């Protein structure tokens, strides 16, 4: 892998814990903690399951969006939900019909719905909006039934590429994110092509295809270096800008590859989903596991603060993302 220096920690993780150094436990913990941070530093408006149930019983103007990928939505979701993965929310909403609506976003738990809500703010959609607190897990904990065997209609969504490009440029300037149009031959970078569920675009050789929100909420499966440049390309410009904004908030050196994403000599192993070992029955209707998982998510930021890091990431309200630093540097400097 061309690393110049590598080391093995003597005594493995047990010795690490013995010295009371920071120690992660859980599932995609870094990304999950980041999601909790966004809720703390933004003005997230929560809607609770009982309130949503009441809304369902009357005529309303809410577009209720499950922001998970299509595959997850089709396993289970909520009554009245439509599906649009978080990275494609801006282009999905940016049309006359959907701009007349108000929005309720949800996932199975917390992280992706928090990201979706903040994204609606980032892209200047001023409509009334809410996060369903705790997602499908809290829905079940509140005594309501999920909807199974759903069929996503995301392929029927229409994209106005001119409007989307205009929106992407505007938001990129707003957050001062870096961009490039150079045909890079450098293979010592991370190259991601954002996978679209709305339209099948041609794969670019040497670029790893990944769902935008999956990349954000399970970053440790895709990016192992905290200071390597990360090029992001999408045939839907707003999806690329979405991804760059979120990666830079997390402290990664993400750059919008605005055009000229060329073929490169690079291969990847297939990224497989990990088995669910952590509160494994939380999506199977087990209330104890659902409650345990949601409580674990709430514990993440207090744990980081115990390590002496009061501001692990930038605030969700910060507009200037031209300079970023990974939170691991902020945490470890205290030890």
What are these regions (language model features)?
Residues 1-63, 67-188, 195-335:
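Rhodanese-like catalytic fold shared by cysteine-dependent sulfurtransferases
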């Amino acid at each position: 892998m061309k690393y110049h220096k590598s080391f093995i920690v003597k005594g493995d993780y047990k010795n690490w814990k013995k010295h009371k150094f920071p120690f992660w436990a859980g599932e995609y913990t870094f990304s999950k903690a980041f999601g909790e941070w966004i809720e703390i530093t933004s003005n997230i408006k929560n809607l609770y399951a009982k309130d949503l149930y009441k809304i369902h019983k009357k005529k309303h103007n809410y577009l209720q969006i499950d922001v998970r990928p299509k595959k997850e939505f089709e396993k289970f979701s909520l009554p009245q939900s439509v599906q649009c993965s978080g990275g494609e929310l801006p282009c999905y909403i940016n049309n006359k019909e959907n701009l007349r609506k108000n929005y309720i976003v949800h996932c199975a738990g917390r992280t992706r719905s928090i990201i979706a809500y903040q994204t609606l703010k980032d892209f200047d959609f001023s409509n009334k909006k809410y996060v369903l607190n705790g997602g499908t897990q809290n829905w079940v904990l509140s005594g309501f039934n999920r909807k199974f065997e759903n069929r996503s209609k995301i392929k029927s969504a229409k994209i106005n590429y001119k409007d989307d490009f205009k929106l992407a440029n505007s938001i990129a300037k707003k957050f001062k994110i870096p961009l490039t149009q150079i045909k890079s031959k450098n293979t010592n970078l991370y190259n991601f092509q954002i996978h679209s569920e709305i339209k099948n675009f041609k794969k670019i050789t040497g670029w790893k295809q990944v769902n935008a929100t999956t990349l954000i909420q399970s970053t440790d499966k895709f990016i192992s270096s905290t200071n390597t440049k990360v090029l992001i390309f999408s045939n839907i410009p707003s999806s690329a800008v979405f991804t760059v904004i979120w990666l830079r908030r997390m402290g990664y050196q993400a750059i919008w590859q605005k055009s000229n994403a060329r073929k490169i000599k690079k291969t990847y192993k297939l990224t497989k989903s990990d088995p669910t070992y952590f509160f494994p029955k939380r999506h199977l209707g087990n209330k104890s596991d659902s409650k345990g998982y949601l409580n674990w998510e709430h514990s993440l930021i207090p744990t980081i603060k115990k390590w002496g890091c009061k501001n692990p990431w930038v605030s969700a309200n910060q507009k200037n993302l031209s300079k970023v630093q990974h939170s691991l540097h902020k945490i470890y400097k205290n030890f």
